[in-house]
């Protein structure tokens, strides 16, 4: 009975197309205005996305870090996970563990690529890009980090959408940059038909080479005029080494322009110390000059060329001794003493 009922009801698509009839309007023909209105709505209606194909590219990226990272690194990791729907997260790794353990973590998480952030001295951040478990891998020093929350740019993109990857033409000039280009393509490009991705392309990742560093930017593509508006985040990758294996092995390339953060801080300290020593030397020279006796220069006759001689006044010689000046205070004291003596005499005479 159930099968016969289903046959009578028909397919769900046919049922959806049939208009519902009310008891009140039973037997009345549909109005032409309503039919025209429905036709216009169907024209304006945006069709849904095309049926997804088969998900063939099974790239999965493990993004995690070591212990001791600061808040900016943590926010950068969250931004990358949000921009890369094919990524996976894991707990922080202990500093005591060796880097080869990450290959086992990738195998357990079913990931074939890894982005690992390694923090040192609570101020230096290193990024490892690795193809697990056979390699190759690259180590970078991360500089100039600016997260999404920090930048507050006007650009925006759909969460889970697929990005375009734009590379500097300089990536094709040198072999180690060509290797890094292929590496970045495999890591940052979202696989087609990924379950967590959206069938839209509305932003672009740009990788630019400047000052022997790789600069990362993320821009929104505006549909109206195809202009670019920056979204974020921003960071700069300074290449250190490229290894043949995953997190180790023979060195394929070493950057000759790389300067470690410790060396950079040492140079800055030496420059400030040199400035301080220079100031102290200037002060010592000034003190020594003050203590030296002044050298008396001989009279230069050419200095008196434009000097006009002053009128000579006659010198008067005083032959008579000048009268002594009257000291008024001493005179008052004498008068006071006389007056006091007279009073004493008078008081004695009256007593007799």
From Swiss-Prot:
Residues 34-46 have a biased composition (Basic and acidic residues). Disulfide bonds: none annotated. Coiled coil: none annotated. Keywords: Acetylation, Isopeptide bond, Nucleus, Phosphoprotein, Ribosome biogenesis, Ubl conjugation. This is Ribosome biogenesis protein BRX1 homolog. There is a cross-link at residues 159, 313, 321 (Glycyl lysine isopeptide (Lys-Gly) (interchain with G-Cter in SUMO2)). InterPro entries: Brix, BRX1. It is found in: Nucleus, Nucleolus. Belongs to the BRX1 family. Pfam families: Brix. The gene is Brix1. Its main location: nucleus. The modification Phosphoserine is found at residue 260. GO terms for molecular function: RNA binding; rRNA binding. The modification N6-acetyllysine is found at residue 275. Residues 59-248 form the Brix domain. It comes from Rattus norvegicus (Rat). GO terms for cellular component: nucleolus. Residues 1-47, 281-301 are annotated as: Disordered. One of its GO terms (biological process) is rRNA processing. Required for biogenesis of the 60S ribosomal subunit.
